[in-house]
Amino acid sequence: RDLRMSRGLGDVYKRQRYNPTDKCWMVWDGARWKRDDLATIKGLADEMLDQMDKACFGIRDINTAGALRRHVQKSRSSRSKEAFLKEAQHLPGIPMLPEQFDRNKGLLNLRNGILNLARRELVPHDRARYITRMAQVDYDPAAQAPVWEAFIQSVTGGDAQLAEYLQVMVGYCLCGSTREQCMFFLYGDGANGKSTFLETLAKMLGDYCMNAQADTIASTRSRSSGAARSDVARLKGARFVTLEEGDQGATLDEGLVKQMTGGNTITARFQYGKEFEFRPEFKLVEATNHLPKIHGTDVGIWRRIRLVPFTQSIPEEKQDILLPQKLEAELPGILNWALDGLQKWLANSQGGRRHGLPACAAVDSAVSAYKQDQDRIAAFLADCTEPAEGSTVQASVLFRTYLNWCSENNEKWRMANKQFGMEVKKHYEIRKGMYYNEYVDMALSDEGMRCMALGRGTEPSVAPARSRPLYEQTRLKN
């Protein structure tokens, strides 16, 4: 009986789809496919039963009509509807996997149609394209955004290079490509426009934009490696992900950021759900007053960091409290501004070139300063060592000095001995001796000698003489 009902339901439901991975029905609302969170599908079941009930009046045989009416009444119970809805999930043409939705990364679904981003061609909404998201803006090729352009001029301080960088960055975020393999930090003290910038773009992009907690990309010991990452799973299909500002002193989860920006398939799962794979198409953007700590010094993480400075503080008397509403009225023009940026990005990345973002001295300088500030080994070596031709320092002595220096400077994160040695080798040659390894042409500075002796109860017994090899300076009993 349930199978017969589900087949009858299939005729009504042929315009609906079932997602077996997320265990939800997908319904077409005339512009996009949406999760059936309002139980529309059960309403369709009631409509089908109403039609069957009406059909009874056209049946001449009383017994047949009575049997059908009794069958309809039984089917109205919640248990019966759940049963034939479950059967309908498997009917031909109804099941559809998540990866079958939103497959064309070069389209942007808008309120007045589907926009081909490369050609700027608008076509009517089409259920056969299986698009599940929609930006909250109309495409109007003649629309302009003078207030927005003045705002960009203000927040960049008239830096034309930085203004163009922002335009191309936003244009790149419209499409589903992650070719740049990077994340963006909008950095600066308050009252500089970065929040207004992101909020305006979030309004424009609608479903294509999602907000994530700062913990999503923060490294934390409390998170187990096998924990359900529903915070990552929910980002599937988004193109623009804004991150809440993290706590001061938070550490970036470098491995996860590499995964999320690398363009490769990642695995996630909703809590209590099955694991699934997806290829990210979102770009991560965080507006912050304080940057996260980055322990890694490898190219793999730093080539992914884009630090966009927002350094123009807007005095309170010049702040326009109506600016958000004015910018919202210009969303069609802002879309055209972003599309111009996308055209520049596409032109710059032709011929297989990975990077389409333009050169920007302000961004490059900010990243360089950030990297230098985060290189704690370089800071330790600058504090505690100095070049000294002919002198050496035992590797174990230098590592002990480093640990003491970390304690002195409240450095919560400390490198293991092996990793520490690999980092120091980038600055000094290491030589293997008969009894121990030693760094060549290095001497401990006065600060280094002080740190070396910390916790021993005594001061160094030998002054840091520059004329003798350092292994003689530092030969102290462990």
What are these language model-derived features?
Residues V27, R32-A45:
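Trp- and S/T/G-rich repeat-edge/linker motifs of beta-rich repeat architectures
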Residues R1, R7, D11-K23, M52-N478:
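Feature primarily recognizes SF3-like P-loop helicase cores of small DNA viruses
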